[in-house]
């Protein structure tokens, strides 16, 4: 019982940390990295994002925003640049008034 309480307390402490603290503790070091130009990129780790919208452009923007938000939350703002990411893919479906898009990319930072 005591071990469970200690584990629960540690989990609550980690979950309560701001994303900058997570990055400062090296959570991005869980993945191997490679240099691509002036960037440092995750070697084989992809992040995904999905979104919907009334137009294809809005659905794509929502998918990119989801990718940015999750990546920055997990590794910190420096990793949350979709413009810096590599190996990007985007797929969309639907039609006028109801589009859905998904994107995948390897995070990079400058």
Model-found features: residue ranges?
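Bacterial N-terminal signal peptides
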Residues: 8-16
């Amino acid at each position: 019982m005591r071990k469970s309480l200690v584990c629960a307390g540690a989990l609550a402490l980690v979950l309560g940390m701001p994303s900058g603290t997570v990055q400062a503790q090296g959570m991005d070091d869980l993945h191997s990295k490679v240099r691509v130009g002036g960037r440092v990129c995750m070697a084989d780790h992809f992040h995904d994002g999905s979104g919907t919208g009334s137009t294809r452009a809005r659905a794509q923007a929502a998918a990119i925003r989801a990718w940015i938000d999750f990546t920055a939350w997990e590794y910190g703002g420096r990793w949350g640049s979709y413009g810096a990411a590599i190996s990007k893919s985007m797929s969309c479906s639907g039609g006028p008034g109801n589009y859905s898009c998904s994107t995948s990319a390897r995070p990079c930072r400058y």
